[in-house]
Amino acid sequence: MIGGLEHLARRGLFLFDPEAAHGLSITALKTGLVPSCAAPADPRLQQSVAGLAFPNPVGMAAGYDKNAEVPEALLKIGFGFTEIGTVTPRPQPGNDKPRLFRLIEDEAVINRLGFNNEGHGAALARLKACSREALIGVNIGANKDSADRIADYVTGIRTFYAVARYFTANISSPNTPGLRDLQARESLATLLSAVLAAREDEAGKCGRRVPVFLKIAPDLTEEGMDDIAAEVLAQGLDGLIVSNTTLARARLRDRKQASEVGGLSGKPLFEKSTAVLARMRRRVGPDLPIIGVGGVSSAETAAEKIRAGADLVQLYSCMVYEGPSLPGRIVRGLSALCDREKLASIREIRDSRVDYWTGMNV
């Protein structure tokens, strides 16, 4: 539960429009105004995923730290890893404002930001100043007006290869027209082939193989999930991130804001994204790493993602409502779960409810 000081801070931030509040939170992290809420290290929560050693399974999702301004500050407040971006080769302003909306009754957010970011150059300069030990992923995308979107992803791999601990190819944002078309089998095959070829080329140059994940939408058909699973396995991708925001608006209480165009995130996304996670786990088998995202607001929801097939989890929107102590509270809660269930590793619960979530009608 959110503490008294965080409650007051939230009330203050909610006096501002969402984008202004986001900027203030970045400034607070930059200036050290956010106290560390990190939980003690717990070996039962440590995970080896895609060749990387994660100190705990709770990460900051892409979208918060778009321009790599505060990755190390986020790690200090309790996240085991963080993901910057989405970054595009050239700076772009994104869509017209207003483009970010709070659904307070639902503890949700709708955004139609449109990959607003300062471009590769600005993010790269900041990441070069970070510790090489910091577990920072780079989420790469394509410029809205790009003549060759696949080339933009390849450029992202090459530009950030020396500083990224892992990459995420974001082809599932609903806010860049036509981007989700890259999830179609033929387009996906071309994209993954190009991205992985660039990765192998860069790995040969520097002697370090950086994992590549694919972030997918929660609004896929069964056939779409089949195609993605088949292509990911055929091409030898390192993992999936499930899922991005949804276009669905089922069971929302805030009907006024629900009519806004854009992707929905936060608590209402939990069931849908977790069901898609389980269905993808069923399709790809037990070995492919999956990061579960969508509606993670507590230790229990984080654990449920793991039970549904996730190796790691990420969050963002729920921290808007729960405050910066949320990652530390989740990590403490997962340690407590290990105590209660006498687990040697949190991994022991993985896949234990895949069948339940696969059958969930969402």
Swiss-Prot record:
Biological process (GO), any one: 'de novo' UMP biosynthetic process
Record-level Gene Ontology MF annotations: dihydroorotate dehydrogenase (quinone) activity
Enzyme Commission number(s) of this protein: 1.3.5.2
Active-site residue numbers: 173 (nucleophile)
Top-rank lineage group of the source organism: Bacteria
InterPro entries according to UniProt: Aldolase_TIM, DHO_dehydrogenase, Dihydroorotate_DH_2, Dihydroorotate_DH_cat, Dihydroorotate_DH_CS
Main location: membrane
Official protein name in the record: Dihydroorotate dehydrogenase (quinone)
